[in-house]
UniProtKB/Swiss-Prot annotation:
It comes from the Bacteria. Residues 24-25, 50-52, 87-91, 118-122, 160-164, 201-203, 237-238 are periplasmic. Residues 1-23 form the signal peptide. One of its GO terms (biological process) is monoatomic ion transport. Residues 33-39, 62-76, 103-107, 133-151, 174-190, 213-228 are extracellular. Outer membrane channel protein allowing the entry of N-acetylneuraminic acid (Neu5Ac, the most abundant sialic acid on host cell surfaces) into the bacteria. NanC proteins form high-conductance channels which are open at low membrane potentials and which have a weak anion selectivity. It is found in: Cell outer membrane. This is N-acetylneuraminic acid outer membrane channel protein NanC. It is a multi-pass membrane protein. It catalyses: N-acetylneuraminate(in) = N-acetylneuraminate(out).
Amino acid sequence: MKKAKILSGVLLLCFSSPLISQAATLDVRGGYRSGSHAYETRLKVSEGWQNGWWASMESNTWNTIHDNKKENAALNDVQVEVNYAIKLDDQWTVRPGMLTHFSSNGTRYGPYVKLSWDATKDLKFGIRYRYDWKAYRQQDLSGDMSRDNVHRWDGYVTYHINSDFTFAWQTTLYSKQNDYRYANHKKWATENAFVLQYHMTPDITPYIEYDYLDRQGVYNGRDNLSENSYRIGVSFKL
């Protein structure tokens, strides 16, 4: 009930200012992870405002990918994200923001700051640092109850190929702060995501995505499996 009230409040915030808001976007995505033999679905609603604010809410559902003691995550989760764009000039933008993640395990907060550079009209770069702090404790490798907090660095490249296609690459490095390990048996892990969007109409954009997720696969009690993610989705301007 408490979570529902929070999400209702965020939705009200996102859609209560039509005079200054841009078009909202609905993103529907499905995916499959080869190492974990897992399926995912995601629904995401986002909206930006002309005064610099941006907000989103998304819901993720998995099958049994996390049905393993070595994987500290939940099968279903909801997250809310808010950021504010500060224009430094015509090319550079700083975006401080906050991501709040709700799951059956508890709540995670992810304050971040992102720096974006519009090199040209068609080519854009970005870097972001985020600190994921968990409001709940989990057993660490020493058997103690601690917080599995994470430092996260992201890099972004977006290239507008032509009026029909856009290509994007996101690279991510995770580093655990305390005595925990990823499924690759290390304190750090990497991810690389490659996305190709097709602008079918001004309001409808289907896309495909391939991610290499390091050796983070978990399946039937085994971990350290090579993990590939294949996704397909479509976004709609509402």
